[in-house]
Amino acid sequence: MSIRTERVAELIQRELSGIFEKELPRSGVLTTIVGVKITPDLSIARVYVSILGSKEMGASVMAHIQKENKHFRKLLSSKIRHQFKRMPSLEFYQDDLFDQAAHINELIRKANEASSPTPKPDDEA
């Protein structure tokens, strides 16, 4: 990734985070933009969103984000319009890395419990 694309990705991430904080409904889930990857020609910004909360609420928030894609792009464009000739189109993806890490930790914990011998009680007479 070139320095220009990294700077653009950081700018989009920072500004979209502020937009999400103001625009997304407060529904008991924590929504965070964990990363933005932008194509070399700056035409597409892939935005990775982490949603902490129940699966149902996460799906609902992600559906809302997808539905309001054009609205978020318009708000973002109004904030950073002087820095681009053409605003990149936004693609939102749910980042489930936190869930995957929790699942792997659970598997490791179960494997450790299964492999460790259970202590036998001492017979005291």
Curated annotation (Swiss-Prot):
Annotated GO MF terms: ribosomal small subunit binding
Subcellular location(s) of the protein: Cytoplasm
Assembly description: Monomer. Binds 30S ribosomal subunits, but not 50S ribosomal subunits or 70S ribosomes.
Protein name: Ribosome-binding factor A
Main localization category: cytoplasm
PANTHER family: RIBOSOME-BINDING FACTOR A, CHLOROPLASTIC-RELATED
Function recorded in the entry: One of several proteins that assist in the late maturation steps of the functional core of the 30S ribosomal subunit. Associates with free 30S ribosomal subunits (but not with 30S subunits that are part of 70S ribosomes or polysomes). Required for efficient processing of 16S rRNA. May interact with the 5'-terminal helix region of 16S rRNA.
One GO BP annotation of this record: maturation of SSU-rRNA
Family: Belongs to the RbfA family.
Superkingdom assignment: Bacteria
